[in-house]
Amino acid sequence: MVRVKICGLTCEEDVHAAAGYGAHAVGFVFEPSSPRYIGDRADVLELLRSVPPFVVRVAVFGSLRDLPADLWREVDAVQFVSGKAIALPLHLRRIRAVRLRTEEDVRHALRLQDEADALLVDAYHPQKMGGTGETANWRLARLLRDEATKPVILAGGLTPDNVCDAIAQVQPFAVDVSSGVESAPGKKDHLKVKEFIANVRRFADGS
C-alpha cells in the first residue's frame, strides 16, 4: 500500500485524527514563514509526544536549521528543501524536498539522492516552500520515480478527490497532504483526512 503522511499538524486533536484514520507519518512545520509553524510554541514537546507509537514524526523545514536536542529526540525524520543534513542526529531519516518544472530539475533531484533517504516532490512556487495547494507536475514526478534509487514521495495539491489519479500516474512510495485536508491553514478537516486515507486504501485494494 502507498503510505500516507498528513503534514502541517498544529494540535493534538488533529494528530489523533490523522493517526486514528491510519496515517503512517505526520509532519510538523518548523519553518517560521509557514502559517503552520509550531517551533515557537511552549507546548511543542507535548505536541510531538502526543503521536502514537509506530507513527513517524517528521520535522519539516524550508531551509534546514538546528533544533534543541530535546526536540530532535522527539522526531524520527527531517524534511527539507535546502541545506546540508550532515550535522543531524544519526537516528533521523532525511527527506529531501524537490520542486520540478523541467527535466533538468529531475536530473538535479537525482544528484541529491546521496544526501537523502527519500525524495519528496512538491509543487513549484516562486515564494513559498510547500503547503501552497498547487499541484505538482505528475509527469516529471513519474520520471523521477522511474529513475530514482530512493523512495519518491508525492506532495503538492493532493486532495481526497485527486489522490487516486495521482497514485495511478506517479506510482509513488508515499503521498503527502497538508492544505488538501484543511478547513483553514493549520486546521485539519477530520472528514477530509478520513476520506483521503480511505481513498488511498481503496486504490490499493483495487476497489
Model-predicted segments: where are they?
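Conserved N-terminal beta1-alpha1 strand-loop-helix module at the mouth
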Residues: 1-207
